[in-house]
Amino acid sequence: MNPIVKSFQYGQHTVTLETGVMARQATAAVMVSMDDTCVFVTVVGKKEADHGRDFFPLTVNYQERTYAAGRIPGGFFRREGRPSEGETLTSRLIDRPIRPLFPEGFLNEVQVVATVMSVNPLVSPDIVAMIGASAALAISGIPFGGPIAAARVGYMNGQYVLNPTTAELPQSDLDLVVAGTANAVLMVESEAAILSEEVMLGAVVYGHEQMQVVINAINEFAADVGTQPWDWTPPATNEALKAKIAELATAELGEAYRITEKAVRYAAIGAIKQRVIEQVIAAGVEDDAKKIGEEFHSLESRIVRGRVVRGEPRIDGRDPEMIRALSVGTGILPRAHGSALFTRGETQAIVVATLGTERDAQNIDELAGHRADRFMLHYNFPPYCVGETGMMGSPKRREIGHGRLAKRGVAAVMPSAAEFPYVVRVVSEITESNGSSSMASVCGSSLALMDAGVPIKASVAGIAMGLVKEEEGFVVLSDILGDEDHLGDMDFKVAGTTQGITALQMDIKIEGITKEIMEIALKQARGARLHILKVMDEAIQAPRAEISDFAPRIHTIKINPEKIKDVIGKGGSVIRALTEETGTNIELDDDGTVRISAVANEAAMEAIRRIEAITAEIEVNRIYEGKVVRLADFGAFVNILPGKDGLVHISQITDARVQNVADFLKLGDVVKVKVLEVDRQGRVRLSIKEANAPTEAVAPAADVAAVEEPAAE
């Protein structure tokens, strides 16, 4: 075993690439470390092409092992199970920038597996995994147009920060991941605290500049390894087939792409395609329907792209900057806490907001430890939204990714827990889809949150931009259709308020996207965003003053932290009785914060009254009404507050001499008593005879029903 090692400085971190020791039966394997965060990345590529597929079969699996953080997994089996949402999102983060760099026509199956084996809590493993995937592909010999590199960019105190630590990120106004080659940016994923277009573009450019050191290091590493490239040549173009399909379909296909309604257009194109396949086979030009279909798709692309570059109307007749017709409604579901219907052209989302209590927060077990997520946004894309049948089940990678993007778009305007103590779940149900359903989810989420009475800082809207770039020029498209996304060169999604950007996602399929193109796209996206926000404001301008009648009311009070045990009671008896008898949910924090939630406000008020009674301090010289709970030879014990009894000595019952306590008091009697003393041990001395003075004020009787524990003597 002859290890090959390459180390270099990347911002504040030292990165090491190593190969030649482990997983030698894989096509390539690299251990990447960045300040004790180690990710082992393997690449396996099949030597035989899978010609039965009409897409490149690339699979990326990112997996975190709990041993990396020195922990044993929870659960019955004590081992890692299905990928978490975070692992799925990181798999997509690796996949998106490398997929467009495999050559067209390459159909050999490739699998990238990234395993986190050691984690420094300050260094997130996602950037490390992306670097490792690039390095492994670079030394694999598989046809690949890389290497790529990745960088995380923060923005603090007006300055960009390269690869901020997990401790620095909470103070950053930006969390942006950018990936690209030496010459081009390929992917951007970001969340921002309402930043300007200039700051966002600057972050992308800064990250691309800083990552050049990684690209250079990977090139040197690959040269040291010296793997021979695969002997692969792209499939030759069948010029006769290309010409025949153009002859048979150009005119008719051109007319089909002037049909504005998606379903009708697809039906027309499908009929043309079937006829062309039959005619081409009959003519003896090609007998493989799959190859005919691929060339037919190429003709579709040339027709649509050519029209756009020549300045002709788009598929649905719009000009490049025009937004599809908008329709907005709120409060569409009577029992939901907040709901909205957002429609943009043939893309539509029903979005529903639900308010819950602290116990409804999502508990997430990560390598860095446990955390509770108080804001959830889930995106569902059922097959009927595109007029198809299909399997229904757990969310797929795409749904998880789109949900996270929509969440990023809205997160910056969400109130803090102190401002709004509710846990919030938003669900976006896509009911129609023809491009940019994730951005429809952003718009619908903003509307539903306002309808639910969540005090968000501002309305948020999202828009998807596209690009068609040819030798003769380029055109940036606003509010792209599904076909324009599929046939174009860029998917550029921007969410934000009137003041700035909250989320930016960019996926580019070609090299050569310049700063100028990104500037135009951001400027055009701002105009589109402001237009959408104006329409949304006509439906609802500000969060509703009151939450839904069907949402729980949360009341927060503070008690002495030393009294928490009294509210809980022995074995939880007191708090259990409180919740069952009042119909509320009660949550306590170690600092004495108590949150009481109930749909009925009266129930919450009753629970608060009883908690305040339980935690009240006994005041010396104050008169209370209490119930006699025990008799003794030397006096009587009287309960004056929940869980708090005091002793009325036999000499303090009356002015007359008392021989037998039972002659004057019986169990259950309600009497007025005055507090004479509370000693250091918390024992309370009471007097009935001194309480009978007519000038003294009487405290309310204790809520005896709240007492679940026998009082201590």
Swiss-Prot record:
State the needed cofactors, names only: Mg(2+)
Catalytic activity, as annotated = RNA(n+1) + phosphate = RNA(n) + a ribonucleoside 5'-diphosphate
**Family matches, as SUPFAM superfamilies:** Eukaryotic type KH-domain (KH-domain type I), Nucleic acid-binding proteins, Polynucleotide phosphorylase/guanosine pentaphosphate synthase (PNPase/GPSI), domain 3, Ribonuclease PH domain 2-like, Ribosomal protein S5 domain 2-like
Q: What are the alphabetically sorted keywords of the record? A: Cytoplasm, Magnesium, Metal-binding, Nucleotidyltransferase, RNA-binding, Transferase
**Domain KH per the UniProt entry, residue ranges:** 552-611
First-listed, main subcellular location of the protein, grouped into a coarse class: cytoplasm
Output the SMART domains linked to this UniProt entry. Answer: KH (SM00322), S1 (SM00316)
UniProt-listed Enzyme Commission number(s):
2.7.7.8
Q: Which residues form the S1 motif domain?
A: 621-689
Is this entry keyworded Metal-binding? yes
Task: Give a yes or no for keyword Nucleotide-binding in this entry.
Answer: no
| InterPro entries according to UniProt | ExoRNase_PH_dom1 (IPR001247), ExoRNase_PH_dom2 (IPR015847), ExoRNase_PH_dom2_sf (IPR036345), KH_dom (IPR004087), KH_dom_type_1 (IPR004088), KH_dom_type_1_sf (IPR036612), NA-bd_OB-fold (IPR012340), PNPase (IPR012162)
UniProt cross-references to CDD domains, sorted A to Z:
KH-I_PNPase (cd02393), RNase_PH_PNPase_1 (cd11363), RNase_PH_PNPase_2 (cd11364), S1_PNPase (cd04472)
In the record, what terms sit under GO molecular function?
3'-5'-RNA exonuclease activity; magnesium ion binding; polyribonucleotide nucleotidyltransferase activity; RNA binding
Q: What processes in GO biological process is this protein linked to?
A: mRNA catabolic process; RNA processing
Binding-site residues, Mg(2+) = D485, D491
Q: Which family is this sequence assigned to? A: Belongs to the polyribonucleotide nucleotidyltransferase family.
Record's PANTHER family? POLYRIBONUCLEOTIDE NUCLEOTIDYLTRANSFERASE, POLYRIBONUCLEOTIDE NUCLEOTIDYLTRANSFERASE 1, MITOCHONDRIAL
According to its UniProt entry, what is the function of this protein? Involved in mRNA degradation. Catalyzes the phosphorolysis of single-stranded polyribonucleotides processively in the 3'- to 5'-direction.
Question: What does the record note on quaternary structure?
Answer: Component of the RNA degradosome, which is a multiprotein complex involved in RNA processing and mRNA degradation.
Which HAMAP family does the UniProt record give? Answer: PNPase
Q: Know the name of this protein?
A: Polyribonucleotide nucleotidyltransferase
